[in-house]
Regions:
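Binuclear metal-dependent hydrolase catalytic cores
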Residues: 1-158
Length: 159
């Protein structure tokens, strides 16, 4: 099992627009110091799951059929804006496991395109996704959202 952090920034990201602090100045000078919107990739056996889809370049990063699906914690823009581009793909279906949130981000549920929101997580529900065990834990974050707890062979982590 391998976890790759693709984006660790909050809604502001780093560098923060207009900020002149040392960290933001350094991030402007060195791309490696930038913090992109939330997203991670978990690879387990022959499966690849995206945890949150905050990156806007998902269609360039992940060729068609390269993801097993998406584990979405909630639908704030900084965690889900990549879905807005991804949904317009063709020739495949990508399962999105996350909380039921038809009011979530813009009109994603109304116009899902290739995204399949048909299996939302319930609080404390555990699912087996191949060798990966995933549990949705409720969390209040301006509205009720989910924290994803993932386990592989006895090891666990919260995202």
């Amino acid at each position: 099992m391998r976890l790759t952090l693709l984006g660790t920034g909050d809604a502001r990201q780093v560098p923060v627009y207009g900020c002149q602090c040392v960290a933001c100045l350094a991030a402007r000078a060195d791309q490696a110091l930038r913090r992109l919107p939330c997203s991670a990739l978990i690879e387990c056996a022959d499966q690849r799951w995206l945890i949150d889809s905050g990156l806007t370049d998902l269609t360039e990063r992940f060729p068609p059929h390269s993801l097993s699906g998406i584990l979405q914690t909630h639908y704030h823009a900084d965690h889900a804006q990549g879905l807005l581009h991804l949904r317009w793909g063709q020739g495949l279906v990508i399962p999105v496991h996350g909380p039921a949130d038809p009011e979530g981000l813009a009109d994603l549920y109304k116009h899902p395109g290739i995204l399949d929101f048909s299996q939302p997580f319930a609080a404390f529900e555990t699912r087996a996704l191949g060798a990966l065990q995933v549990t949705a834990l409720p969390l209040m974050h301006s509205r009720l959202t989910s924290v994803i707890c993932w386990r592989v062979k006895g090891s666990a982590s919260l995202t």
